[in-house]
């Protein structure tokens, strides 16, 4: 097949794939999300009128409960909040290192909120029994504590004794990041056998969840039987429940774009686990939970079991650390690196490595792009030489077409013989494009899903590499005092990317086919419009990649 035609097909397929992929996976879900939010808001307004007496802001409820029920204060460099001693519930948690947005008055990110608040989201670890006669701590139990503050330096010990003299002890420790360790001990001082089961749950109110787009997973997630399980909220709503019986549960939880809450049960046995949906009093709730097999504690014996709760930011190195330290399989997959995981995670590691030296992820992107370009130089050189040879062979190919145009078999045979004689690979020109596709999407994933890139600045007006360029040419990049609509937000970096793409085309061999040449001239304009809503970090990569390609082609032209 003619090399120019193949390049045209590859370029068009790549462009259309990105355009329609973006429309289908991002723009369309976002539009649907907006329509759903409008409808939900109307229903929510009616619902709030009915539930207004029941629902209070999280901060108000915490203050109210603090006056009625004692709470253990959580305080570390990473977290602040409290644990309710009524029912031993983790329901008040704020991430101190992260703000909601870049505004001066932005509040810190709240992860957990009490059960009857608007954004209810909480975790529990406790005990149940298959015998109703066994008196165990429950949601109404008021625990006694030996301390008022939980910190990395100060664990807390809780205790409660039932009417039969059975003693229940809980020790809670917190590391310097986001991991709580909960050790439960039962001292059976009664004269009866005590059947108990350990459980853990995470419960969340649906309206508090940001609607997910198809480019990443948000919702129930876990590693069960060494396989990653991911369910959208709609999946669980349709099924009502997804159950796993007597399974190896490494972890289960709920994930957002940047935040994760997960339960990590003791590894001493298998567990039954559930992903549930319930509609109660007009409020939609989702829950993930696990429960252990029945453990019989004989009279005079003790039993202990340890579980963990992770509640915080999905930092790559932190999840890797916990995965290695506690043997939590696939814990890093809570970050949705996508289909190109095998490429995406090394790309992140490379960016993070250079960030440690230069202190700016934008500069780190530039360095990684240079390395990728050097690794692909030989391939690009061969591709460029092949394209040039194909252009030089075009007159001979046209002559063969005129001779054997009616005999397709002979035509293909003669053209292939010409390629073999001149040592030309007709598909070589497509290889750099094919290789760049996974690299492109890997960098996009890194920018879009990793907490490290969230609100990471570059220079000048770029304050967040994971967000689109905030400027637009239609108000002269902010010099005119008005804000154009979103579809006119074509900023400086998209324009720079289009200019460098145009210059790169001028440096490349011009296609012999005039139709193809005309189509290729419009590609920078197409990419300009399409890329304007992409994360600016991706535009920095693409612009810099184009500049390096121009330098590379100049070098090849000069020495080849």
Swiss-Prot record:
Recorded hits in Pfam families, A to Z, give: 60KD_IMP, YidC_periplas
**BP term (GO), one:** protein insertion into membrane
Q: Which domain of life is it from?
A: Bacteria
Going by the UniProt record, its keywords in alphabetical order are: Cell inner membrane, Cell membrane, Chaperone, Membrane, Protein transport, Transmembrane, Transmembrane helix, Transport
Q: Which GO terms describe its molecular function?
A: membrane insertase activity
**InterPro entries tied to this protein:** Membr_insert_YidC, Membr_insert_YidC_N, YidC/ALB3/OXA1/COX18, YidC/Oxa/ALB_C, YidC_ALB_C, YidC_periplasmic_sf
Instruction: Provide a GO CC annotation, any one.
Output: plasma membrane
Is Ribosomal protein included in the keywords of this UniProt record? Answer: no
What membrane topology does this protein have? Multi-pass membrane protein
Q: Where in the cell is it found?
A: Cell inner membrane
Q: Which ranges does the record mark as transmembrane?
A: 7-27, 334-354, 357-377, 431-451, 476-496, 522-542
Quaternary structure (record): Interacts with the Sec translocase complex via SecD. Specifically interacts with transmembrane segments of nascent integral membrane proteins during membrane integration.
Q: What does this protein do?
A: Required for the insertion and/or proper folding and/or complex formation of integral membrane proteins into the membrane. Involved in integration of membrane proteins that insert both dependently and independently of the Sec translocase complex, as well as at least some lipoproteins. Aids folding of multispanning membrane proteins.
Q: Member of which family?
A: Belongs to the OXA1/ALB3/YidC family. Type 1 subfamily.
Which named protein is this? Membrane protein insertase YidC
